[in-house]
């Protein structure tokens, strides 16, 4: 049966054998090129950030036109991201994301619109990049989950070391405190290890809380002293850096995690290549690492 992007409110059941081509891995690609690259490399689906979707709509793309491109290629639109500071107000004050609005209602509505139009499975959210976690963070996350549930959307909180949700323990506290069935975690290998986490901290996470795994690699020591600059420019393909990905994936497999793997490699080096080249390299590298960890990905390159 061909893949369809016309399943509003539908949350597909996926596993670690299903690969998603994250927005940032081919961040400079046009929508058509992104979809074509994902299809050629055998990805189950793609990610599209909330601001990117909003720009496409502003440029005149209709949901029907976007859906046609996806359906013709046999690719699902599975994830979205870009909800910053779910319990904060104002804007990011400094760094590469300066000026981005926290708890941006336009981004939230874009996520819900994508869920309604394409059956997007999950949206990733982060804490704020200044200050401390707000006292009402649990309540705010619960509210976001409730609004997302009306659109069949899962909400995956991603800990980022330089944010108000810096590690797995903090993220688990928010998610379990909120207690919403569509709320859970996005676990990124880069953020886990760059934030001082290890396999022991990963083993403490209940498997059913993990909604999506982001896989990437890189050097153990930072290339740039600014965390966000480093994370947005110097990642490497899985298996080509120094992070212990086999141990990372081994814990997830042993603890019974069933979540798709989103390949998110933010890299200036990859930016110099074509989207098709990047998608092929990312798929091959990820499948190799998964196989070595005893996880057999679905879908060979077409």
What role is predicted for each listed range?
Residues 46, 143-242, 293-299:
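Acidic/histidine-rich catalytic cores of soluble enzymes
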Residues 17-23, 46-48, 77-82, 123-125, ...:
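Hydrophobic faces of well-ordered beta-strands that scaffold small-molecule active sites
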Residues 38, 46, 70, 115, ...:
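Conserved, mostly hydrophobic/aromatic
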Residues 22-26, 49-53, 82-85, 128-130, ...:
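Active-site beta-loop-alpha junctions enriched in small/polar residues
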């Amino acid at each position: 049966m061909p893949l369809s992007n016309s399943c509003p409110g539908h949350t597909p059941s996926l596993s670690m054998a299903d690969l998603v081509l994250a927005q940032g891995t081919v961040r400079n690609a046009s929508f058509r090129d992104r979809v074509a690259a994902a299809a050629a490399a055998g990805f189950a689906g793609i990610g599209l950030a909330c601001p990117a979707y909003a720009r496409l709509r502003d440029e005149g793309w209709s949901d029907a036109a976007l859906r046609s491109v996806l359906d013709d290629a046999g690719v699902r639109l599975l994830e979205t991201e870009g909800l910053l500071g779910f319990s904060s107000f104002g804007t990011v004050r400094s760094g590469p994301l300066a000026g981005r609005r926290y708890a941006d209602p336009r981004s939230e509505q874009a996520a819900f619109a994508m869920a309604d139009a394409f059956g997007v499975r999950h949206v990733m959210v982060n804490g704020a990049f200044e200050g401390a976690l707000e006292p009402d963070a649990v309540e705010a996350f619960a509210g976001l989950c409730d609004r997302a549930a009306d659109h069949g959307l899962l909400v995956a909180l991603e800990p980022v070391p330089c944010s108000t949700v810096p590690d797995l323990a903090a993220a688990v506290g928010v998610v379990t405190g909120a207690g919403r069935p569509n709320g859970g975690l996005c676990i990124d290998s880069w953020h886990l290890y760059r934030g001082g986490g290890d396999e022991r901290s990963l083993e403490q996470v209940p498997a059913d809380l993990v909604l999506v795994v982001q896989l990437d690699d890189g050097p153990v020591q930072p290339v740039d002293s600014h965390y966000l600059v480093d994370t947005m420019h110097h990642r490497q393909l899985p298996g080509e850096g120094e992070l212990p990905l086999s141990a990372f994936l081994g814990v997830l497999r042993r603890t019974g995690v069933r979540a798709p793997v989103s390949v998110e490699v933010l890299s200036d080096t990859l930016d110099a290549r074509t989207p098709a080249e990047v998608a092929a390299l990312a798929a091959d590298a990820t499948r190799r690492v998964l196989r070595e960890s005893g996880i057999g990905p679905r879908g060979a390159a077409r």
